[in-house]
């Protein structure tokens, strides 16, 4: 068995209908990601198992946008000599079809009722009620139908009422399991997300999405919205996830941040392809390496995060290092 396993970690790619045309200046940064992986990741990383995408693959959930994303991800897979289907993804707010979740639609009415719930018990009760009601259960996933059918389904990461979360297992070097686990944070996402210009609408997760405890399993979750963007009374869901998920990957905020809460490592990823109108435009992505190490007869999970950042000249991705460090990665 190989010593460690690795992943390429992307988030917020935002492919548009113009991506790849003759005037797309962001084609350069995507090319530089491919070049960086070819020149550097292949020599630094052992046993790359896949590409992780924490949502906002598309800009407006159009089929053509997902087709372009698929081509880009295939190029990465080809460089790494892994299967083109070794992609693991979750939806973001840009992956919803806003024409489905319009005001007055059945979905919008259900979302509005869910948004009114103000306790964990009420949230879980309403989610369970709508999910079990045959007249409405499929409606909860209607706004990501294009995402599911034209993109995520190709990687077995599509979600629905029968499979609200996906999971994939990889063997660790101590014969235990690393389990990737997809969380859906866009249940109530709609065109109203930014209706209040002073604050964003908080998203609902629900306890039904918290992975179950299982001996010998280490969880690494993917979710678009981080916990500070959740409507989570008393932080009930977050507390459960912090206890059960050792590595948590998030997107959405376009801010690179790594922190620890007890035994859980929380990685907020910067945007791979942010809008150039965004203040502090700063394309980023990560490499992640995971292994179990033994120290004085005890075993520990060792995680290395290689933070990659585009240079100001936009000519290559390099390691984002602390001023006082020469390390190419952060180790936890």
Question: Which ranges hold each PLM region?
Answer:
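Beta-strand-turn-beta hairpins that frame and shape the catalytic cleft
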Residues: 1-8, 163-182, 217, 260-265
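N-terminal active-site segment of His-dependent metallophosphoesterases
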Residues: 1-90, 96-101, 208-214
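Active-site neighborhood of phospho(di)ester-bond hydrolases with catalytic His/Asp-centered motifs
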Residues: 9-11, 49-56, 82-93, 220-228, ...
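Active-site environment of divalent metal-dependent phosphoester hydrolases
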Residues: 16-18, 58-61, 91-104, 190, ...
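Active-site-proximal segments of metal-dependent phosphoesterases and phosphodiesterases across multiple
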Residues: 21-22, 185-249, 258
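Extended active-site neighborhood of metal-dependent phosphoesterases/phosphodiesterases
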Residues: 70-196
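Conserved beta-sheet core of the metallophosphoesterase superfamily
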Residues: 175, 227-298
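A short C-terminal boundary segment appended to hydrolase-like catalytic domains
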Residues: 290-332
């Amino acid at each position: 068995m190989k010593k460690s396993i690795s992943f390429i970690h992307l988030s917020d790619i935002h492919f548009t209908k113009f991506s790849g045309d003759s005037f797309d200046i962001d084609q350069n940064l995507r090319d530089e990601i491919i070049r960086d992986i070819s020149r550097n990741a292949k020599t630094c990383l052992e046993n790359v198992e896949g590409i992780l995408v924490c949502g906002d693959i598309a800009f407006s959930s159009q089929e053509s946008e997902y087709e372009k994303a698929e081509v880009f991800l295939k190029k990465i897979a080809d460089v790494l000599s892994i299967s083109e289907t070794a992609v693991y993804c979750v939806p973001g707010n840009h992956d919803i079809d806003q024409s489905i979740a319009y005001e007055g639609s059945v979905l919008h009415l259900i979302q509005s009722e869910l948004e009114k719930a103000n306790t964990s018990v009420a949230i879980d009760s309403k989610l369970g009620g709508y999910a079990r009601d045959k007249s409405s259960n499929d409606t909860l996933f209607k706004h990501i139908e294009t995402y599911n059918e034209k993109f995520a389904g190709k990687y077995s990461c599509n979600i629905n009422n029968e499979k609200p979360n996906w999971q994939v297992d990889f063997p660790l070097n101590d014969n235990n399991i690393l389990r990737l686990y997809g969380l859906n944070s866009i249940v109530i996402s709609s065109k109203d997300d930014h209706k209040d210009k002073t604050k964003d609408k908080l998203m609902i997760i629900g306890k039904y999405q918290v992975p179950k405890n299982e001996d010998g399993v280490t969880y690494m979750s993917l979710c678009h919205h981080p916990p500070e963007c959740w409507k989570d009374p008393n932080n009930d869901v977050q507390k459960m996830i912090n206890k059960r998920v050792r590595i948590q990957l998030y997107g959405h905020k376009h801010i690179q941040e790594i922190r620890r809460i007890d035994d859980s490592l929380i990685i907020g990823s910067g945007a791979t392809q942010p809008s150039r109108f965004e203040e502090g435009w700063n394309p980023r992505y990560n490499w992640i390496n995971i292994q179990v190490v033994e120290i004085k007869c005890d075993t520990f999970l060792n995680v290395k995060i290689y933070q990659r950042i585009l240079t100001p000249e936009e000519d290559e991705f390099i390691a984002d290092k602390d001023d006082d460090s020469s390390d190419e990665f952060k180790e936890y």
